[in-house]
Amino acid sequence: MSAKWEKKGANDGELTFEIDLDKISEGLDVAFKRVRKNINTPGFRKGKMPRQIFNKMYGEEALYEDALNAVLPEAYEAAVAEAGIDPVDQPQINVEKMEKGEAWVLTAQVTVKPEVKLGDYKGLEVPKQSRRITIKDVEQELETRRERQAELVLKEDAAAENGDTVVIDYAGSVDGVPFDGGQADNYSLELGSNSFIPGFEDQLVGHKAEEDVDVTVTFPKDYQAEELAGKEAIFKVKIHEVKGKELPELDDEFAKDIDEDVDSLDELKEKIREELKQQKNDAADAAIQDTAVAKATENATIPELPQAMIDEEINSQLQQYLGNMQQQGINPEMYYQITGTTEDDLKKQFAGDADKRVKTSLVLEAVVEAEKIEATDEEVAAELKSLAEQYNMEESAVRSVLSDDMLKHDIGVKKAIEVIADSAVEVKDAK
């Protein structure tokens, strides 16, 4: 194999390579076995024509196209490896020379991964993160957990307030015409939850059970049902019940009820403090990581990105998002129907920062190379086990989707992030 790479632009060039006689012979054998199955020749059973007879009747050249298709993928892959390039798209291949008894010569117009010139990526200044947990933080979390244990109690002859739950019938219309999804009976709605159209819940505040209320609202201009977007609607609402929250007492019994690992309210508060501390530390570490990696990306010099890389990133984000929906039991068709969106809408959404994500990935890969980062077999095994547990899959199933090289790449990128983040310096007034 002989391969030559000639750079033409920032991210593209021409790869010239040869297919030697041995490989050509292998390809011709494959091609002949394929075509002779369908040849009827007087004096021979179908599919049994000798090679010499075929060559005499049709010429060996008749096999060249099929032979090339048989050996080209391996030959191109070998040429790419020899030239040391990293293609990001399907090449445009041309045959330059294809003569009997000589090596075949081909050229491929190839788009390659941009060459990244790293700037500063260690010791970067990042804003100092707060990791302090206050008494107020603990009290707010305690109150949140208390709210979760609240019971709904019927409010007799009392006006509804924000935070109350009302049981209602409603029927909506636009210009006097009912619309799909605009009616329901005995619907429980928490006022102030903002789960209905803006303004709907506010107009029920102050009303009592057994009252009839006309609620007038305007659908948002970006409402998912286009036929309703921006239009005024009137809802006839009947309030059946008004229920208020009855909160449990904050005492030792409450603590033991919601957490079997504690015996008192003080123990619960201490446990909450430790949990909040861990959450705040994790959030601070993530903020440092995000800021430092973003700065490292800004400091790097990266040529204009090939569109193929941006498109691949958009499709990757799309598949990941839809995959997450599938895990929740929502297939793509159902998701598009529920949200009133299309695949193109999602692609436009992910296209917004696709360029930034690709550049970040390129910089992290460059750091892996600069730092000579490698993943051990033990780390690959641990990553495989972690992914299997995360997605509730057998390790063999994960391995069928992710090769060792892919796992090593992901581990290397994680280590590169650690190199950047661990060396970052927290500064109070960092920009």
Curated annotation (Swiss-Prot):
GO terms for molecular function: peptidyl-prolyl cis-trans isomerase activity; protein folding chaperone; ribosome binding. Residues 163-248 form the PPIase FKBP-type domain. It comes from the Bacteria. The keyword Chaperone applies. GO terms for cellular component: cytoplasm. InterPro entries: PPIase_dom_sf, PPIase_FKBP_dom, Trig_fac, Trigger_fac_C, Trigger_fac_C_sf, Trigger_fac_ribosome-bd_bac, Trigger_fac_ribosome-bd_sf, Trigger_fact/SurA_dom_sf. Its main location: cytoplasm. Gene3D superfamilies: 3.10.50.40, Trigger factor ribosome-binding domain, Trigger factor, C-terminal domain. GO terms for biological process: 'de novo' cotranslational protein folding; cell division; chaperone-mediated protein folding; protein transport; protein unfolding. The keyword Isomerase applies. It catalyses: [protein]-peptidylproline (omega=180) = [protein]-peptidylproline (omega=0). Involved in protein export. Acts as a chaperone by maintaining the newly synthesized protein in an open conformation. Functions as a peptidyl-prolyl cis-trans isomerase. Belongs to the FKBP-type PPIase family. Tig subfamily. NCBIfam families: tig. Consists of 3 domains; the N-terminus binds the ribosome, the middle domain has PPIase activity, while the C-terminus has intrinsic chaperone activity on its own. This is Trigger factor. It comes from Latilactobacillus sakei subsp. sakei (strain 23K) (Lactobacillus sakei subsp. sakei).
